[in-house]
A protein has these predicted regions:
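A C-terminal functional module that forms or caps the active site or interfaces directly
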Residues: 811
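Generic alpha-helical transmembrane segments
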Residues: 720, 794-808
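Conserved cytosolic headpiece of P-type ATPases
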Residues: 1-742, 747-750, 763, 778, ...
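Extended substrate/RNA-proximal surfaces in nucleic-acid metabolism proteins
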Residues: 785
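Transmembrane alpha-helix entry/boundary detector in multi-pass membrane proteins
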Residues: 788-793
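Alpha-helical transmembrane segments of multi-pass integral membrane proteins
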Residues: 757-772
Length: 894
């Protein structure tokens, strides 16, 4: 077993303290020590955890009460009916096994997420071993190893930095911050500093974008920050979706109802009618078969699958089927900021030049020195395909130049760079020197306004250079402050001309400068995101932002998107540091007042999601980074990003946006609401039929009739009803579906008038079937009892089958007339009804089938009676719907 590693607060300690704590030095470890530590601590990789066998996953699918009752019914059918009941049993068991196989297919997402985490790791690291730089498999790194870093590297383990030469590391996947972090060894950090502020640390799987560094490995494997997230993923409790909760509730209700009714029926058969135990048991089994909609699990699966196909065409890839319906229940959309609500691409938004603040969309003159400086003092590379490679801030400046028709590659041909002073975190400046055609040199300097303004002695306005005044400086500082309030990252541009290449010292190169301008940049919101937020609010959904980025940036983007009111001066931002001060109970009391959470860790995100879930809300969480994975898994529906998202976040999600478009979520919510509405229709359709079947058998038992046989019920439930039920699952959305409030976690399939419809429509079907059965007995066309009984049995069976087909039209809407919702809008429905009719008729007219189904040939008169009986189903339901609309029940159900 691997030795436990310390997860100390290394960022609060000096380099010397950390080296001492890790038993290391700047010379690195010896090979012997490294080998011993590898044996002690284990490899630098993530644990896979104990994997369940395929058989265990398969057996887990049979824990549902309804499935157990179905299996019991199949076994009892064989016991009581022998070979005659074998066909019924095989049909039931086939449905059960197919459903279980699909359930197994849906499992295993946590393992996939952890595998993706493993694949992100850097394969090779450069470490100091035996006082030499050697390439080491990153999985063989151990605590105490000294590792070298340079631009382009993936950080192979968590480490405390010992050297940082202009080192910048992009940590967006861990922190959500879109700008690479300038690493600073001199920083003194508090114990509660969030990951994004730990500027003297480098974390596994982060990307080195600039400079060089040296660090001592502090943690490997599952003890790294990424490993910590992997552990959270593996141990996360997945929340049952509202659909699963509803299906579980439905299973329990049906199961208990079946047991009670079967017991009562058996008691009546034995004690009232004096039947033997075996015949009574056969009747009870028939009733169980009638009561349980055997095809429901499979039909729900098919409806959800069809929903996934619709969503796939609209850029939403569903990874877990129940997520389709969960979308429709969503009450809270907790969105990550970077890459989800924003473009994850730094962009120039404002330029202050010639004493004026202009929008980036306005055209600048190609000779504008601000434009020249931002492109000259820049290390961005352009690959052959035109892709910009480098620090996101610098690539934003070059992209702005290209948008202004200023191609720095062309300009540098005539004004080549001949010297430079690289950026470092102490000066916070970068300077380059460029040869001019006249023989002199142009010095371009960019950097932090507070550092650069002190080195400026002149200012340029419209081509004229003059001494800078205090009033000029106040105007520059005021503009800088105004841009910073908008959460823009501000850089200052300055320059000077010199006669010779200066001595490359900061005091020489970066003094006596001419102020040129300010540039304000931000990772901007997606163009369609604000409209999506508005539509979400209109649909009764509350969008909130959860990000690891800075408070001011988060608040500014949230106001621009409408997540919080731009005119409201109250503090709407809650930080991770503040959250650390609260217990879960304390946070539960205040969380509702905040719409934006900034500077939060993965644990914080999970706490926020759980707080909303504890309040009974259905939560959708979006994200694209490694840091989002635990909360994606905890949420009712985790939504990953297909383009910018890490494989880890995709693996932990239920749904992936193929276009990374926040607005696509709203489209998916509409589809989800439609899917739930259609599943409701399917359940209403099936359960009203099952109610009728149960009542028919129960009443037949009570009065000594023989109305329907188990094979009739199985054929209707599994074959005749299945096609219309599936077709109802793809009905078009009813008008106004996105103006309703979300149905919420605690609503059921029986809400909105569905339960009352199931009851009265089930009773109505029973009355019509028994009415036709009674007619056949009262007005027989034969004199022999067996033939009379065969006709009555056949007419009852045909009437029930036809009622199911016409009733499918009734179920298109709970309250609206079938003639207003549209008879022929659903193409699948249009052909499913006649096809189901042919399947029903096949059992009567196809030779061989009639004997198997125990039916007789009906006369024209008998056919007319069955058609009238089934047709009355539509007439009566239409009358009831008309009365309900007059009473306003349709409006109350919304």
């Amino acid at each position: 077993m691997s030795k436990e590693q310390k997860r100390d607060l290394f960022y609060t300690q000096s380099e010397e303290q950390v080296l001492s704590s890790m038993g290391s030095s700047l010379d690195g470890l010896s090979s012997d020590v490294a080998s011993k530590r590898l044996a002690d601590y284990g490899r630098n990789e993530l644990d896979e955890g104990e994997k369940r066998t395929l058989l265990a996953k398969f057996l887990d699918q049979f824990k549902d009460l309804m499935i157990i009752i179905l299996i019991a019914a199949a076994i009892l059918t064989v016991i009581t009916e022998g070979s005659h009941g074998l066909t019924d049993a095989i049909i039931i068991l086939a449905v059960v096994v197919l459903n279980a196989a699909f359930g197994v297919y849906q499992e295993g997402q946590a393992e996939a997420a952890i595998e993706a985490l493993k694949n992100m790791s850097s394969p090779v690291a450069r470490a100091l071993r035996d006082n030499h730089v050697v390439e080491v498999d990153s999985k063989d790194l151990v605590p105490g190893d000294i590792v070298l870093l340079e631009a382009g590297d993936v950080v192979p383990a968590d480490m405390r930095l010992l050297e940082a030469n202009s080192l910048k590391i992009e940590e967006a996947a861990l922190t959500g911050e879109s700008v690479p972090v300038d690493k600073d060894l001199s920083a003194v950090l508090a114990e509660d500093a969030p990951i994004g502020d730990r500027v003297n640390m480098a974390y596994q799987n982060s990307n080195v974008t600039y400079g060089r560094g040296l660090g001592v490995v502090t943690n490997t494997g599952m003890y790294t920050e990424v490993g910590h997230i992997a552990g959270m993923l593996a141990n996360a409790d997945e929340t049952d979706t509202p659909l699963k909760q509803n299906l579980n509730q439905l299973s329990k209700v049906l199961t208990y109802a079946v047991l009670v009714i079967a017991a009562v029926t058996m008691a009546v058969s034995v004690f009232v009618r004096g039947e033997g135990i075996l015949p009574a048991l056969m009747t009870s089994v028939a009733l169980a078969v009638a009561a349980i909609p055997e095809g429901l699990p499979a039909i729900v699966t098919v409806v959800l699958s069809l929903g996934t196909q619709v969503l796939a065409k609209r850029n939403s890839i569903i990874r877990k089927l129940p997520a389709v319906e969960t979308l429709g229940s969503t009450e809270i959309i907790a969105s990550d900021k970077t890459g989800t609500l924003t473009m994850n691409q730094m962009t120039v938004e404002k330029v202050y030049t010639n004493g004026q603040l202009v929008d980036a969309k306005e055209t600048l003159d190609a000779s504008n020195t601000t434009l020249r400086v931002m492109n000259f003092a820049n290390d961005t590379k352009v690959d052959p395909t035109g892709k910009l490679i480098g620090d996101p801030t610098e690539t934003a400046l070059v992209q702005f130049g290209l948008d202004q028709n200023f191609d720095v590659r062309e300009v540098l041909v005539s004004e080549p760079r001949v010297a430079e002073l690289p950026f470092d975190s102490t000066r916070k400046l970068m300077s380059t020197v460029h040869q001019q055609a006249a023989g002199n040199f142009f010095v371009a300097v960019k950097g932090a306004p507070d550092q650069l303004l002190k080195r400026v002695t002149q200012i340029e306005e419209n081509g004229t250079i003059r001494p800078i005044t205090d009033a000029d400086k106040q105007a520059i500082l005021a503009t800088n402050k105004d841009l910073a309030k908008q959460a823009l990252r501000v850089l200052m541009m300055a320059y000077k001309y010199v006669d010779a290449i200066p001595e490359l010292e900061s005091d020489v190169v970066e003094n006596d400068l001419v102020f040129s301008g300010l540039v304000g940049m931000i990772d901007p919101e997606r163009p369609e995101a604000a409209e999506a937020v508005r539509v979400a609010k209109e649909a009764g959904i509350r969008p909130i932002m959860i990000t690891g980025d800075h408070q001011d940036t988060a608040e500014a983007i949230a106001k621009r998107l409408g997540i919080i009111d731009p005119n409201d001066t109250e503090d709407h931002v809650f930080t991770g540091a503040e959250l650390n001060e609260l217990t879960d109970e304390e946070f539960q009391k205040v969380f509702k007042q905040y719409s934006v959470y900034a500077r939060v860790s993965p644990e914080h995100k999970v706490r926020i999601v759980k707080a909303w879930q504890n309040d009974g809300k259905v939560v959708a969480m979006t994200g694209d980074g490694v840091n989002d994975a635990p909360s994606l898994k905890t949420a009712d529906i985790g939504i990953g990003m297909g383009i910018t998202g890490t494989e880890v976040s995709k693996g932990a999600s239920d749904m992936v946006l193929a276009d990374d478009n926040f607005a696509t979520i709203i489209v998916a919510v509409e589809e989800g609401r439609k899917v739930f509405s259609n599943i409701q229709k399917t359940i209403q359709y099936l359960l009203s039929a099952n109610t009728a079947e149960v009542l028919c058998i129960f009443l037949a038992t009570l009065f000594g009739w023989d109305v329907l046989e188990p094979v009739h019920l199985l054929w209707i439930n599994l074959v005749t009803d299945t096609l219309p039920a599936i077709a109802l699952g793809v009905e078009p959305a009813e008008p106004g579906i996105m103006t309703h409030k979300p149905r919420g976690r605690n609503s059921s399939f029986f809400s909105g008038g569905v339960l009352s419809s199931i009851i009265y429509q089930g009773i109505l079907q029973t009355a019509l079937v028994l009415g036709v059965y009674g007619f056949a007995l009262l007005y027989p066309e034969h004199s022999i009892y067996e033939e009379i009984h065969a006709d009555a049995l056949t007419m009852a069976y045909v009437t029930l089958g036809l009622i199911q087909l016409v009733h499918a039209y009734n179920v298109k809407s709970v309250y609206q007339s079938v003639f207003t919702v549209g008879l022929f809008k659903n193409k699948l429905f249009n052909w499913s009804i006649p096809f189901a009719f042919l399947l029903l008729m096949a059992t009567i007219v196809v030779p061989g089938f009639s004997n198997f189904f125990h039916v007789s040939v009906l006369s024209p008169t008998q056919w007319l009676v069955t058609i009238i009986g089934s047709g009355l189903m539509v007439v009566v339901v239409e009358i009831v719907k008309f009365v309900q609309r007059k009473m306003g029940l349709d409006e109350k159900a919304i």
